[in-house]
From Swiss-Prot:
Gene from which this protein is expressed: rpl10e
Gene Ontology CC terms, in alphabetical order: ribonucleoprotein complex; ribosome
GO biological process terms held by the UniProt record: translation
Protein name stated in the entry: Large ribosomal subunit protein uL16
Keywords: Ribonucleoprotein, Ribosomal protein
Taxonomic path: Archaea, Thermoproteota, Thermoprotei, Sulfolobales, Sulfolobaceae
Family: Belongs to the universal ribosomal protein uL16 family.
InterPro entries in UniProt: Ribosomal_uL16, Ribosomal_uL16_arc, Ribosomal_uL16_CS_euk_arc, Ribosomal_uL16_dom, Ribosomal_uL16_euk_arch, Ribosomal_uL16_sf
One Gene Ontology molecular-function label: structural constituent of ribosome
Gene3D superfamilies in the record: Ribosomal protein L10e/L16 (3.90.1170.10)
Species of origin: Sulfolobus acidocaldarius (strain ATCC 33909 / DSM 639 / JCM 8929 / NBRC 15157 / NCIMB 11770)
Amino acid sequence: MPLRPGRCYRKFSGPAYTRREYIPGIPMPKITKFVMGNVNGDYDYELRLITTEKGQIRHNALEAARVIALKYLSKKLASEQNFALVVTKYPHHVIRENKMMAFAGADRLQDGMRLSFGKPIGTAARLEKLGELVMYVRVKKEHLEAAKEALKIASSKLPIRTKIEISALNKEAAAQ
């Protein structure tokens, strides 16, 4: 069955569904790497991708944002030693779907909304507060514009609105 659009899972209501020991058949999240680049480097600026609304981000959207940001930064900065990219959210919440048949005569084969709890189809990261950090990039001053563009492209892959905040990491960068 094809994947539903992100708008189907953007909003949330009720408590998180996270108790994996009681949930059989949870698919593994697509996102596996959360830290990329040279984390121990000496950088001037930190750019943060911050949410401006509450919502959920599915694991495949997080992975798409990570991949596109990493690809753009690697291409523009020529090496993964020139930046540090960290995804801070993990998809804990298990998403369920009550699969419905959509063909002639399906009403005789299925029960509709009776026993409609649903089966696990994926995971999502819940962002329950405004201003939560999704990912950040650390770069030197000369790579600031490329990092801004990378986060802007990555934010287009996410189902909720975000903004980019820039902060200086050392005193020389703050003075300029």
